[in-house]
Amino acid sequence: MKITLKTEKLQEMVSKAIKGCSNDKQIPITGLMSIDLTDHRLTLTTTDAINYLYISEDKIDGEDFSVVVPAETFSKLISKMTSENISLALTGNELGVDGNGHYRIELPLDEEGELIKFPNPLDSFDIKTVAAKYEVNLTTIRQLLTVNKPALDTNNDGSCYTGYYVGESVVSTDSYKICGTGIKLFDEPILIRPEMMDLLDVMTSEKIGVYVDNDTVVFASEGCVVYGKVLEGISDYKIDAISGLLELDFPSECSVSKDAILQALDRLALFVGQYDKNGIYITFTKDGISLTSKKSSGAEVVPYKTSNNFKEFTACINIDMLQTQIKAHVLDEIKICYGLDNALKIIDGNVTQIIAYEEDDRL
């Protein structure tokens, strides 16, 4: 069994497929890659044991072919090839790779000494009979990866807040910060795992079909399919309370240059010590937003672009959280709402963020 294809095409496919590997040493399959040619359609498959990534290409010459290889070794070898074409040939328990030279990759075996067969959960998933079908845009997915991802809970494995709440809107939170994007994707809300959302970034087609059935969700576009399980715990997700916070009215608001405030925070960060717990003072003055380190060794005022219902207000806020949330914005100018004792709100188009203030004895 042998296949031959353009080196550039195989490199492109492998560079995408490798992103589906989690390389968990406790779960060997997460470090493997399936290579399958059926009816001239080549498919590379990888998994993290929950999500499966399929990268496909049609019109590939060769006999039907199926093999499972060590993903890292295969990926690194293919990336270093400079020949015009690459040939893959299965001989016994080895995969021959011919390009600039001839290389033999030893193939993994199961407990009975047979070549490993890669599971394919798509075989039992019938797109025609799924409960719900939707279509989303790749640009929307990439917007969510930019603005919502930084607000996910990354410190509590298994928490429902590690996932994206996707329904009438898209929400992410770690209880200290919230991000809500006013885009309706699904009629019935689900929690999408962060690993699955990350895999969608390898897609290149703008239109993506989404198929949801019980605890399974599949994203499919030209040449790429992502199969996985929804994150459990949606009944524990306090979406009503979170949405209420996003909709809070603040007495005052202003707008500032995104670049100007980020540059000021970057300079001020040099004067924030470990005992400050990343806290800085943010004061809304008549001239602009004053940013001050706790020891007053660094201070800077970012001028307003606009200001409405001004009233001087001071709070302590985590500089890392503030920087991360502002960096996620796309527009050059951001609107900041303030005046409540517990948090501030940042608005950028259809994106709303809430950042909780830090407790401080001086305030």
Regions found by a protein language model. Give the residues of each.
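Structural preference for solvent-exposed beta-strand-turn elements
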Residues: 1-363
